[in-house]
Regions:
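Positively charged, small/polar-rich N-terminal and surface patches that mediate targeting and assembly
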Residues: 24-25, 73, 95, 112
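N-terminal small/glycine-rich loop or linker at the start of catalytic domains
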Residues: 25-52, 115-138
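Short beta-strand segments at enzyme active-site cores
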Residues: 34, 72-80, 111-119
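Glycine-rich tight-turn/loop motif centered on a GG-T
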Residues: 2-5, 45-54, 83-98, 126-144
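Active-site cofactor/substrate anionic-group-binding motifs, chiefly glycine-
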Residues: 42-74, 78, 90-93, 98-102
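Alpha-helix-loop-beta-strand connector modules within alpha/beta enzyme cores
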Residues: 87-118
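N-terminal amphipathic/basic leader segments beginning at the initiator methionine
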Residues: 1-21
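Conserved small/polar residues in nucleotide/adenosyl-binding loops
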Residues: 149-150
Length: 150
C-alpha cells in the first residue's frame, strides 16, 4: 500500500492524543532524591544541585511531606555518614544514617515507598565504590560487603 498522505487521525486534537498516548508521566511516577547527612541538623542547600538540599535526620520527614504534597509517592535515599572508613562499614551499621532515616520515614509515612542507594562511595574514606586492594577495587570483597548492606 502506497500512501501519498500519512494518516494523522490520532494526532488531530488534544483529546484524542491524550486518549491514545502510550506514555503518561505524572508526579506519582517520579522518584525524588533525598540526601541525608548524619552530622546535619536542619537542611542545607546543595550548591551543585540548585533546588536540592541535604537533610539532617531531624528534617528528613519534612522532605517526605513535601514530596507527598506534590504527589510524589517514592524517594531514593543517599546517605552521608558521620564515619567513613576503608571498607564503608557505616553502610551496613544497623544504626547508620540511612537505616535511621528509613525508620523515621516509615514510622510517619508507612505507605511511602523508599528506595536506597547501595553504592558505597559515600561511605568509604577514599571515595571509591568498594574495598580497595592496592589501587583497584576488590570486587569480590566488595560484593561480600554489599550483601551486608541489603
Amino acid at each position: 500500500m502506497e500512501l501519498t498522505q500519512r494518516p494523522r487521525r490520532l494526532r488531530s486534537g488534544d483529546t484524542i492524543r491524550r486518549m491514545c498516548r502510550e506514555t503518561r508521566l505524572s508526579a506519582d511516577s517520579l522518584i525524588y532524591p533525598i540526601f541525608v547527612d548524619e552530622t546535619l541538623s536542619g537542611k542545607r542547600p546543595i550548591d551543585s544541585l540548585p533546588g536540592q538540599f541535604q537533610y539532617g535526620l531531624d528534617t528528613v520527614e519534612e522532605a517526605v511531606a513535601e514530596c507527598i504534597a506534590a504527589g510524589v509517592r517514592s524517594c531514593i535515599l543517599f546517605g552521608i555518614p558521620a564515619h567513613k572508613d576503608a571498607v564503608g562499614s557505616s553502610a551496613w551499621d544497623a544504626n547508620g544514617v540511612i537505616q535511621n532515616a528509613i525508620r523515621k520515614i516509615k514510622a510517619t509515612y508507612p505507605d511511602f515507598y523508599v528506595i536506597t542507594d547501595v553504592c558505597m562511595c559515600e561511605y568509604t574514606d577514599h571515595g571509591h565504590c568498594g574495598a580497595l586492594c592496592g589501587h583497584d577495587v576488590d570486587n569480590d570483597a566488595t560484593l561480600e560487603d554489599r550483601k551486608s548492606v541489603v
